[in-house]
């Protein structure tokens, strides 16, 4: 369980850092939620996987994995495509 928690936490932190480094106008150009909204969602995902894990347990870890997964699978490729960067 600890290995899974660390994997979800690393994924959430990676998604948060990636979202923070992108241009704000790329989110609207890709027709996705705005940058501040994604930073709040992914910040909450990091909190769920780290600070709030003792309170929410596996439910918090699952919500964190879902939020990070949606960003990495749906939003990130569109942002890279809009900005002309490779994957």
UniProtKB/Swiss-Prot annotation:
Residues 1-19 form the signal peptide. InterPro entries: DUF2516. It is a single-pass membrane protein. Keywords: Membrane, Signal, Transmembrane, Transmembrane helix. The keyword Amino-acid biosynthesis does not apply. The chain crosses the membrane at residues 39-59. GO terms for cellular component: membrane. Pfam families: DUF2516. It is found in: Membrane. To M.leprae ML2453. This is Uncharacterized protein Mb0486.
């Amino acid at each position: 369980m600890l290995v899974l928690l660390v994997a979800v936490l690393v994924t959430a932190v990676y998604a948060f850092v990636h979202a923070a480094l992108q241009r704000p106008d790329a989110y609207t150009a890709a027709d996705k939620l705005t940058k501040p909204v994604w930073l709040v969602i992914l910040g909450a995902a990091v909190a769920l996987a780290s600070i709030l894990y003792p309170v929410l347990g596996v439910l918090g870890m699952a919500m964190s994995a879902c939020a990070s997964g949606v960003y990495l699978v749906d939003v990130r490729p569109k942002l890279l495509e809009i900005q002309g960067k490779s994957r």
